[in-house]
């Protein structure tokens, strides 16, 4: 297992630690239609967001290694002379931005800041389905959450599984459900 922690893995960990464990163990969920759609529209959506935000310039699909974090930022936008990461989501903007989306953005902030050697206080999430942009600012509580998730993921990458914590609302449609055994399968209910 790699010791590089991708911001997507941080997002997944905060949504469901067991799913992050399976991904880190080399068993990623097969791409869903939404995932495939997201990849297809990523460049076009990032360009639309850059234009909407008035970016002076934009770099697309930027791979950054800033241990323990590494991954590919959908775009790095230069706004008012400062770099800001942009994450593209295929979905519509939710009423409240989920904390796992904010933590993923925080990880990109940390990576871009380290890679570019410039202070980065803001990340953007472009929700392509609705064409809306969320601005995520790095705050102390978000930094603490990021540090916590990175610490837990480092333990997972060293082979320590997370504590099982079933959530029926999340587990019901989860691809990893067959391995977690949080919920009985349909056959077991009969």
From Swiss-Prot:
It is an enzyme of class 3 (hydrolase). The keyword Ubl conjugation does not apply. One of its GO terms (biological process) is DNA catabolic process. The keyword Lipid metabolism does not apply. Its cofactor is Mg(2+); Mn(2+); Cu(2+); [4Fe-4S] cluster. It catalyses: exonucleolytic cleavage in the 5'- to 3'-direction to yield nucleoside 3'-phosphates. Mg(2+) or Mn(2+) required for ssDNA cleavage activity. Can also utilise Cu(2+). Mn(2+) binds at residues 74, 87-88. Induction: Slightly induced by 20 J/m2 ultraviolet light. Member of the csa1-cas1/2-cas4 operon. [4Fe-4S] cluster binds at residues 16, 171, 174, 180. It holds the Pfam family Cas_Cas4. Its EC number is 3.1.12.1. Keywords: 4Fe-4S, Antiviral defense, Exonuclease, Hydrolase, Iron, Iron-sulfur, Manganese, Metal-binding, Nuclease. GO terms for molecular function: 4 iron, 4 sulfur cluster binding; manganese ion binding; single-stranded DNA 5'-3' DNA exonuclease activity. It comes from the Archaea. PANTHER family: CRISPR-ASSOCIATED EXONUCLEASE CAS4 (PTHR36531), DNA REPLICATION ATP-DEPENDENT HELICASE_NUCLEASE DNA2 (PTHR36531:SF6). CRISPR (clustered regularly interspaced short palindromic repeat) is an adaptive immune system that provides protection against mobile genetic elements (viruses, transposable elements and conjugative plasmids). CRISPR clusters contain sequences complementary to antecedent mobile elements and target invading nucleic acids. CRISPR clusters are transcribed and processed into CRISPR RNA (crRNA). This may be a 5' to 3' ssDNA exonuclease. Belongs to the CRISPR-associated exonuclease Cas4 family. Can form a Cascis complex with Cas1/2 and Csa1. This is CRISPR-associated exonuclease Cas4. It comes from Thermoproteus tenax (strain ATCC 35583 / DSM 2078 / JCM 9277 / NBRC 100435 / Kra 1).
């Amino acid at each position: 297992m790699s010791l590089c922690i991708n911001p997507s893995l941080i997002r997944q960990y905060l949504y469901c630690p067991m799913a992050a464990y399976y991904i880190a163990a080399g068993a990623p969920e097969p791409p869903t239609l939404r995932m495939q759609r997201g990849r297809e529209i990523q460049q076009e959506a990032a360009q639309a967001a850059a234009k909407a935000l008035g970016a002076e310039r934009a770099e697309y699909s930027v791979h950054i290694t800033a241990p323990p974090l590494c991954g590919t930022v959908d775009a790095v936008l230069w706004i008012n002379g400062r770099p800001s990461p942009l994450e593209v989501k295929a979905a519509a903007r939710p009423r409240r931005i989920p904390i796992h989306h904010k933590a993923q953005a925080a990880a990109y902030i940390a990576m871009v800041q380290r890679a570019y050697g410039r202070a980065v206080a803001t990340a953007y999430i472009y929700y392509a389905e609705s064409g809306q942009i969320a601005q995520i600012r790095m705050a102390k509580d978000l930094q603490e959450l990021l540090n916590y998730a990175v610490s837990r993921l480092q333990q997972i990458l060293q082979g320590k599984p997370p504590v099982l914590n079933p959530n029926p609302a999340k587990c019901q449609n989860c691809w990893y459900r067959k391995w977690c055994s949080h919920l009985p399968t349909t056959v077991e209910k009969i």
